[in-house]
């Protein structure tokens, strides 16, 4: 056991988490595990897409910042909002990344049983927005992400970006990543074109 003088800063990124958005077991784990980290004394931010379904969760979200996100489709805005959730005597921050054309939809990943044709584009944007959120946290809030805990294919590109296109950014250099795969059947496979 390694003793630390301060708790870890943990950014937990998932495409769904209870009670905000759920299609399966991923939401159960992604909603419960961050709260256990908080109970252990760590500073945790749970980061999710700002789906339409989030509005029905009962959480009260307030604006934090609008971040520019560079994508293959050009520069897009990510609207970051925050809710504070009590966890015992502590609080956990839940942040959402909003971009209406990607996330303000009937379903999380599909509609009428058919996957959205732009799921790769949607979650590549989400991953880029996660990276920009980490930079914002470091620069503007002096909150360096010690561990980025990613869940399933929808967030896995973050690990790739940190080792490739974002490897030179000082704000991200000390961040360690953990990728949890909840169901190997969902791999985020898309045509090459």
What are these regions (language model features)?
Residues 1-193:
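Catalytic cores of nucleotide-sugar-dependent glycosyltransferases that transfer UDP/GDP/TDP-activated
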């Amino acid at each position: 056991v390694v003793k630390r003088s301060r708790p870890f800063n943990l950014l937990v990124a998932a495409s769904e988490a209870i009670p905000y958005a759920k299609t399966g077991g991923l939401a159960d784990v992604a909603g419960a595990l961050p709260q256990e980290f908080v109970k252990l004394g760590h500073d945790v931010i749970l980061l999710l897409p700002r789906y339409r379904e989030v509005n029905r969760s009962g959480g009260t979200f307030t604006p934090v910042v609008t971040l520019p996100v560079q994508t293959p489709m050009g520069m897009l805005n990510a609207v970051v909002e925050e809710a504070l959730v009590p966890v015992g005597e502590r609080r956990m921050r839940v942040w959402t990344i909003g971009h209406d054309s990607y996330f303000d939809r009937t379903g999380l990943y599909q509609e009428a049983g058919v996957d959205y044709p732009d799921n790769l584009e949607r979650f590549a944007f989400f991953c880029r927005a996660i990276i920009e959120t980490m930079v914002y946290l470091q620069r503007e809030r002096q909150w360096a992400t010690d561990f980025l805990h990613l869940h399933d294919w929808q967030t896995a590109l973050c690990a790739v970006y940190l080792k490739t296109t974002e490897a030179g950014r000082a704000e991200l250099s000390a961040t360690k990543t953990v990728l949890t795969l909840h169901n190997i059947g969902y791999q985020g496979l898309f045509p090459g074109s």
